[in-house]
A protein has these predicted regions:
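Asp-box/BNR beta-propeller blade signature and adjacent active/binding-site loops
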Residues: 1-211
Length: 211
């Protein structure tokens, strides 16, 4: 390994206060226009907005150079919408729509009481302003929610691509639950892109001494 390189100075602006990587994992985009892009989720706040915003650092040259993508809150501000306090984030990849099309990404956002989901159509460089709350993915209200994990599963389940999500599914940091979400196609948007939704079909509560 080479010596580690402190990257804050290249991306942390003078307005930013906290600037840190989100717990969990980064991903490498597997399909589509941005295949091979490395994504590292992070979150930050600033003097102009005390709540957290989520974004990704991305690299298209195996980590030689990095770029800071925008946050869904940037899109919300541009659209005249209020920014939303975002906690730690994780990213998963949706099924491919074609080699020359950027594969959609979903950002799972930690927030008090539940999980928000944002969508990127350009490999994480920008995000749509909408961050709907998934009603199934409950989370603690205190502490601004709780750390969560979500990954793409390596094989289809019930014939569909799937993700695995884990968090404290209660109003407190308890009831640790793993869920399997089947990825469904739910029509298309105004630009002809597929609307992907999750069917949280299976779950398992983690209990001490058993699984």
């Amino acid at each position: 390994w080479s010596d580690p390189k402190l990257m804050n100075y290249g991306f942390k602006t003078s307005d930013m206060k906290h600037f840190g990587t989100a717990p969990g994992i980064g991903i490498v985009i597997q399909t589509g226009k941005y295949q091979g892009r490395i994504l590292v989720p992070l979150y930050y706040n600033s003097n102009s907005f005390s709540g957290m915003s989520g974004a990704v650092l991305y690299s298209d040259d195996n980590g030689a150079t990095w770029h800071l993508g925008e946050s869904p809150n940037d899109a919300r501000a541009a659209a005249g919408l209020s920014k939303i306090g975002m906690g730690e984030i994780q990213i998963v990849e949706m099924p491919p729509e074609g080699d020359d099309v950027s594969t959609q990404l979903k950002m799972f956002v930690r927030q008090s009481g539940g999980v928000l989901i944002a969508t990127s159509y350009d490999g994480g460089q920008t995000w749509a302003p909408d961050m709907p709350r998934d009603p199934t993915l409950v989370a603690p209200t205190p502490y601004g929610g709780c750390q969560q994990s979500v990954i793409n599963y390596s094989h289809p389940i019930d014939g569909k691509p799937a993700v695995i999500f884990a968090n404290a599914a209660a109003n407190s940091r308890s009831n640790g639950t793993i869920r399997i979400g089947l990825i469904n196609e739910n029509g298309t948007n105004s630009e002809g892109r597929i609307n992907y939704t999750f069917d949280w079909k299976y779950k398992k509560v983690i209990r001490s001494g058993e699984f």
